[in-house]
Amino acid sequence: MGLLPKKQLDFHRKDERSTKKTNVVTNIFYQISYELFAMLLPLFTAPFISRMLGADMLGVYSYSRTLAIYFGLFGMLGVKNYGNREISRHRDDKDLGLCFWSIYAVQFSASLAMFILYIGYTIFFVVDNQVIAAVQSILIVDSMLDISWFLFGMEQFKKTTTCSMIVKLLTTAAVFLLVRNPGDLLEYCLIMGGGVFINQFMLWYYARQAIGKPVFNLKRSLAHVKPMLILFIPVIAVSLYTMMDKLMLGAMSTKAQLGFYEAAEKIILCATSVITAFGTVMMPRMTKLFSDGNVNEGQRYMKLSVEAVMAGAFAISLGILSVSRLFAPIFWGKDFASCAYILSALALSIPFSGFANVIRMQYLIPNGMDHAYIVSVILGAVSNLIANSLLISIYGALGAALGTVIAEGIVCVAQCFAVRKRISLRKYLNCTVPFGAAGLIMAAAVRVIDHVAIVTIPWLLIEIFVGGSVYCSLSLLYLYYTRNELLMAEIQKFSKR
């Protein structure tokens, strides 16, 4: 390690000490906890907000917020993944501060440009609810100040997740205290925007020692622009093809079908947040390992990751598919019973997205294979468009769900094709087979119960308990038989108590 400035060295020493105590599993726990918290909290607050604000004001908020978020998205460019990767590579270097400031200068400049454009849009083009639109500009300032990518690159997940969870709890409390009628929409916007604003200042406080005083180097900043733009392409492509389903459903089918799809999609997004968290945590670790030439250690982590992610993916996917007939009418009401088919179809995409997430976040991006990543996402977007065009008019929301499965499958295959000569795909795919088999046996066991079950909560709980017991038992037997490293470590730790 080169000679670091004293404050930066102090932070780095703290980081090294915490890395010894806080391993990857702990980081994953923090990130999964946050992802689940962030997904579940809106489900808790939604009934209150919808009653207090009403449908019209909620629509105004949703539209203005979405637009502001897109301006912010363009301001961030591809810094989330790119900045994370670069900080991971340089966190032991004496120029860590310079690396940060040169990347942040691009982010700040782009975000400032988007902020000015948004203010211009608000002044000259927004007629109704202009004040609300102006207040939502806080979200673009949030993008301007967002340095979570730096702390992720330093593997400081405890700080980022704890900070974000505290702020979300405070904003939720403020909403319950201050929002009482549709006339409080402005207060609601200020609370939600102010919350993320406070969160960013807390992250800056945590990072202040490592980043040091502002140091700007125009040449270095300009060198970051092209790779940031390259990694921005998949951000836009993913954003488009995740929205495409809803846009095409709204145009080619009924509003009811759109409602069914959106309801089912929220459950899938909540379930897959576990997989997303895994990739977020592992990406900086894998980047550091590969940049230091520790290829064998990196591939060891990948094998463990594939086993962990696919164990979860098959459990979630086939678990949802098995209980969907009872879950849909119990959770949403009998009018949403047909959501069971949509939920089941979307669940089939989870193993594809899980495996692709490991390949993308733990190999493609850490090794700078941005072109392969972009091609795979574009192929997914195009295939989603074609599948939706053919299927939505015939099957409605179910067609959109099948289009998502096809798109996720093609993205997964394309990413596997890109790394086929670099890693042993067969070794990783073989790890998934036992979990797939355990999932199918679980599904068969639950289906036996489903034939006699009636739509009640006790029967749903019985199905979940039986399915979970079967899957966990079979998976643990396999992991024990193969002497899985993580399981053996936990058993050894438990036996010493």
Predicted regions and their residues:
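Membrane-proximal transmembrane or re-entrant/amphipathic helices at the cytosolic face
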Residues: 1-15, 444-497
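Short runs within selected transmembrane alpha-helices of multi-pass transporters and secretion channels
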Residues: 38-42, 46, 65-72, 76-84, ...
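Transmembrane helical elements of multi-pass membrane transporters/channels
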Residues: 26-42, 167, 187-203, 207, ...
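Signature of the first transmembrane helix
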Residues: 2-9, 20-80, 172, 229-255, ...
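Hydrophobic transmembrane helix module of multi-pass membrane transport proteins
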Residues: 4, 105-237, 242-243, 448
